[in-house]
Design a protein with these regions (language model features):
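Intrinsically disordered, low-complexity linear regions
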Residues: 1-102
């Protein structure tokens, strides 16, 4: 499944580290799933932390009435907060990599 913020998330350093650790495929896949889930929450937390209340209200209204218009709205807001989101993603990946190396 491709996520709407996929271009912001580069998992290649993590995948390289998992391969270097010799982690078996099932555990590897489970860890990637955990990282993807964490990244999703990281992106959404950064997004909502940067939305003003009227934008949050607008997004909720879009989700309730016209979900197709919600995605472009969220993409626009992510673009506006790209620096913070990228920073948060980088920090999250660094934490995962540090844990793997221990």
């Amino acid at each position: 499944m491709t996520l709407f913020y996929e271009e912001l998330v580069d998992l290649s350093p993590l995948i390289t580290e998992l391969e270097a650790q010799g982690i078996e495929k099932d555990a590897h896949d489970d860890l990637i799933l955990i990282v993807r889930s964490t990244m999703h929450h990281t992106v959404m937390d950064a997004l909502f932390a940067n939305l003003e209340q009227d934008h949050i209200d607008h997004l909720i209204a879009l989700l309730a009435s016209n979900e197709e218009q919600a995605l472009p709205f969220v993409r626009e807001k992510i673009s506006d907060a790209d620096g913070l989101i990228s920073k948060n993603i980088g920090e999250t990946l660094d934490l995962f990599l540090a844990d793997l190396r221990e």
